[in-house]
Amino acid sequence: RSTLSFFKPVLQKNSTVAWQNTLRQQGEILSRLRELDVALMTCEKIKLQAAASGGKLTVPTQVEELLQKLRVEETAACLQKADLSIMTKTLAQFSIWLHERPLASNLADKKIRKFISRRLNEWSEKLETIDRKYPDFHNMLELHQIRIKIKRFRYALQTLPEVPRDSNLLRRLKRLQDMLGFLHDDFINAKLVQCFLEDAGNVQLRYEAGLFAGWERAKAEAAVEMLPQLWEDFCGALNAWRKANL
């Protein structure tokens, strides 16, 4: 999807947008399942820490059981939506579409290296100024948008053989992406158990849900405070790479 987005300007517009939507819908089928898997992994981490503490930390048993139930239900829903034969047919059709070279008529004769350089320059400039569009690093919805664009840029750098590699830039990019991913997972974990916190009839469940939601809160808050410096370091490395290679 990231590569398709990268080459979108030189592809036939209507069919490219249609394929972007199709691939996005396929990816979204498993998004809820991934969120539940991350939440259950958090339960495992809490259990390990509880064991190491000698029983001083409460294990969120009820929260884990409810999350497991939700995962079973979501798995069944995914198996209904993600029919293997349909997905295989879709990917085969996508492959055929690519082999037919669906280039936009006015760009079909352009040199690929020139296009890649210009496109990377465009994406780099947008990344360097994205904090003006999303200035609040405490806003998780804005951070999610930044994370998507960071991830897309990293995939482009690592996928295209024509792109000059820079280990310093990739290292800073990966660190920033991991930090944003951790903050997103912490935010989603808290949202997943919000309904448990509102269960007035189950005091133990509310307690466990509060423990679960706040388990890595201090770490998340510290990460948010580190983001401006991480962002500045990344932008500095990106600017240097862009000037040297584009």
What do these predicted regions represent?
Residues 1-246:
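Cationic, histidine-enriched alpha-helical/coil surfaces that engage anionic ligands
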